[in-house]
């Protein structure tokens, strides 16, 4: 076993630029299955300012599919998630907003969209695309993941092409088509794209990962 580490970030120093991480504001819209996992990963890698936006309340199924604890049942998701974040690092400036996303909440920095409906994604995107520096959208249906990233005009155009009508979206409710392990993998892919962006590396605009078929397609 190695010696005692006095800096908890030392083992990721070459992969996650600490200074840029500290100066960037991160906003997670929707702290359900994917959003909660992303928020916890961001806390672990050392973000300084983190906003959580969600109007929903933790219920029994969220313990299984989203990783909330039994004692959080009945609490606002943003409050429960904020508590978990502060248990990782009490110095994080975490702002829980128990509400639906409002255009006034659009901000510079990184916006991570983890809402259920295509129509909601489109509305949030319209409010954020002229303000945020990096946009990441995580989607999941059963064991199929899609991660979309936009940081430049070409990637903006590609992202907007995925905002099809809600009637064209895959059917299936978030309760019947969600697993914690798929959400955790999706969150890891999204956090990796944030790490690439922080390092000035090219982002992947579109990642499709079918876990059951063990197939991944990157655009």
Language-model segments: residues:
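Adenine nucleotide-associated cytosolic modules
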Residues: 1-219
């Amino acid at each position: 076993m190695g010696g005692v580490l006095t800096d908890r970030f030392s083992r990721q120093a070459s992969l996650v630029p600490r200074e840029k991480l500290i100066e960037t504001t991160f906003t997670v819209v929707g702290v359900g299955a994917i959003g909660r996992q992303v928020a916890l990963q961001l806390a672990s890698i050392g973000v300084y300012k983190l906003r959580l936006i969600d109007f929903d309340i933790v219920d029994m199924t969220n313990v299984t599919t989203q990783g909330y604890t039994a004692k959080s049942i009945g609490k606002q998701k943003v409050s429960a998630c904020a508590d978990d974040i502060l248990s990782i690092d009490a110095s994080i400036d975490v702002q829980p907003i128990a509400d639906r996303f409002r255009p006034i909440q659009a901000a510079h920095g990184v916006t991570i969209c983890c809402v259920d409906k295509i129509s909601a994604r489109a509305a949030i995107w319209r409010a954020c695309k002229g303000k945020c520096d990096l946009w990441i959208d995580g989607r999941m249906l059963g064991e199929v993941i899609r991660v979309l990233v936009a940081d430049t005009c070409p990637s903006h155009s590609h992202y907007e092409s995925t905002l099809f009508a809600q009637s064209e979206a895959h059917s299936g409710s978030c309760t019947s088509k969600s697993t914690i392990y798929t959400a955790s993998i999706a969150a890891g892919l999204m956090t990796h794209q944030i790490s690439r962006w922080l390092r000035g590396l090219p982002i992947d605009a579109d990642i499709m990962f079918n876990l059951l078929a063990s197939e991944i397609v990157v655009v």
